[in-house]
Amino acid sequence: MTTFMKYLFQTNDKFSYWVPRVILGCVILPHGAQKLLGWFGGYRLEGTLGFFTDKLGVPLFIAILIILGESLGALGLITGFLTRFCAMGILMIMTEAIIMSHPANGFFTNWSGQDAGEGFKYHILAIALCIPLLISGGVRFSADGFIAKRFPL
């Protein structure tokens, strides 16, 4: 394997990193399913693409990457496949969401529904969960770990 592939699949056996990987994947997956499949009250692929491109002005290619990042990236985190790649994608999506969509709404979550939108504290938590995954990789019980052991470098 190349040096890049070695870095991509290299992992360690610390169980504590398993928790943020699986939890982040499980939290992000419903958002991806809303955008891609229309589950949980979402608008499916066509509706979401229309919203991103027409209302937010996001280029079509970037909108597709966001939808795939939230859906397939979350599945990648849950299974531990390409963990660093998926974590970086989600980190970039959450950073963009803070910058582009949520600064006017402030920090806090809109629990009462009286404000115009949601704050960005959820996004900061998701970013914080991505950082140890970028450092550690998939760790125990991950496809990355299986690949690294099966194909030693």
What are the functions of these language-model segments?
Residues 1-37, 60-68, 72-153:
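Extended, low-polarity transmembrane helix blocks
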Residues 37-58, 62:
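Membrane-interface interhelical connector segments
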